[in-house]
């Protein structure tokens, strides 16, 4: 079954940047999501909000991209009390997934309306199969690095993705 990719929207406030995720956030959207987060991070916003009121579910690739951003903004040894990334209006299923993967500590979670902000339409890319595979591999590796208990969950997935990526690289174009 082909699940449509989530819709991503950028909202900018005075001191914060927000990415609103609508639909099922999966590997197909992960490259665009990572690109958006990287670009927003380069602009040095003091606070980031991921608005999830209309996000029904996230797969492990999307969660891994989110966790990698959380680890980058709140690195080990930093004041995690600051928690510069807020997950707003996440449903119980999403919070449970983040808890089970051992990455919830990287984020502040809350409910409620966003402050006034301006909507920006992101320029989305059309990632190749290789780019999607690489993003998925990196996302799962991050989940295993952050929480070693995830190694048993994702070791076979990462092995398969790494092998698949090597096959793609070795094929002549």
Please annotate each region the language model reported.
Residues 107-116:
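Short acidic-hydrophobic, aromatic-tinged amphipathic segments that line or gate anion-handling sites
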Residues 4-35:
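STAS-typified acidic loop motif
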